[in-house]
Amino acid sequence: MSDPVELLKRAEKKGVPSSGFMKLFSGSDSYKFEEAADLCVQAATIYRLRKELNLAGDSFLKAADYQKKAGNEDEAGNTYVEAYKCFKSGGNSVNAVDSLENAIQIFTHRGQFRRGANFKFELGEILENDLHDYAKAIDCYELAGEWYAQDQSVALSNKCFIKCADLKALDGQYIEASDIYSKLIKSSMGNRLSQWSLKDYFLKKGLCQLAATDAVAAARTLQEGQSEDPNFADSRESNFLKSLIDAVNEGDSEQLSEHCKEFDNFMRLDKWKITILNKIKESIQQQEDDLL
């Protein structure tokens, strides 16, 4: 098996642009850059086989750079994806993000927005789960959702906007999150594939409004859900939201806790809902303290 270090050295020599008289006689340097890129890909493959993934990722980045110099944008985009895979598997999330951003930029400039959306969503997951950069993750999910929507992929678009809304709510952007749930409700009405998610969307929208201390808006959401979605009207989600609104209006945090326990006995509350419900409870308790 070839030595990857030697392959990269050969690539570096191959990838030097022609100058002076040599440039006049040799013409385009594209073929030199293509050969240099091939050598870097060979080195990356060897590193990959050895499970030296960060070195493999670095080699793929060098290959992509030569491919761009050769004018092979499509190949460079694919090579950036390979670099991303290596860095991600090697635990180097920062370099994985950089590589994927370069790939997405190429794909979208080439009009490949569906492919760009796929990787934009993946980018959001890394930013959210590995780097905990929620602001950038929100931007990624939102843009991916828009690109999927342009491609008429409603289910995938909704998946992105749900992630976006959930993160906005956890970041305290309750009104913005509520607005996104409104869009999800609108896009899901009459759609047989996503209409079963409506109950959860109405509940989440109402929870965000309660967390924003706007019980009046939450009551409107409850009424809207009961009138527009027959499945929501008599559902546990509807009854739960009504009970929460009543508890907030009465300023009774203990009553709110009881309603949460009752609901949890039938339908397990997920981490997101528990976090938002705790925020609502804290708001009630703050009001109770202010009265003392």
Curated annotation (Swiss-Prot):
Pfam families: SNAP
Keyword Transmembrane helix (UniProt): no
Entry keyword set: Acetylation, ER-Golgi transport, Isopeptide bond, Membrane, Protein transport, Transport, Ubl conjugation
InterPro entries: NSF_attach, TPR-like_helical_dom_sf
Membrane topology: Peripheral membrane protein
Cellular-component GO terms for this entry: cytosol; fungal-type vacuole membrane; SNARE complex
Gene3D superfamilies named in the record: Tetratricopeptide repeat domain
GO molecular function terms noted in the UniProt entry: ATPase activator activity; soluble NSF attachment protein activity; syntaxin binding
BP term (GO), one: autophagy
Covalent link location (Glycyl lysine isopeptide (Lys-Gly) (interchain with G-Cter in ubiquitin)): 261
N-acetylserine: modified positions: 2
Matches recorded under PANTHER family: ALPHA-SOLUBLE NSF ATTACHMENT PROTEIN, SOLUBLE NSF ATTACHMENT PROTEIN SNAP
Protein family membership: Belongs to the SNAP family.
Function: SNARE complex protein that binds to cis-SNARE complexes on membranes and is required for vesicular transport between the endoplasmic reticulum and the Golgi apparatus and for homotypic vacuole fusion. During the priming step of membrane fusion, is released from cis-SNARE complexes by SEC18 to establish a pool of unpaired SNAREs, which are required for interactions in trans during docking and fusion steps. Can displace HOPS from SNARE complexes, which may be a prerequisite for trans-SNARE complex disassembly and subsequent rounds of priming, docking and fusion.
SUBUNIT field: Binds to vacuolar cis-SNARE complexes composed of the v-SNAREs NYV1, VTI1 and YKT6, and the t-SNAREs VAM3 and VAM7. Interacts with SEC18.
Full protein name: Alpha-soluble NSF attachment protein
Organism name: Saccharomyces cerevisiae (strain ATCC 204508 / S288c)
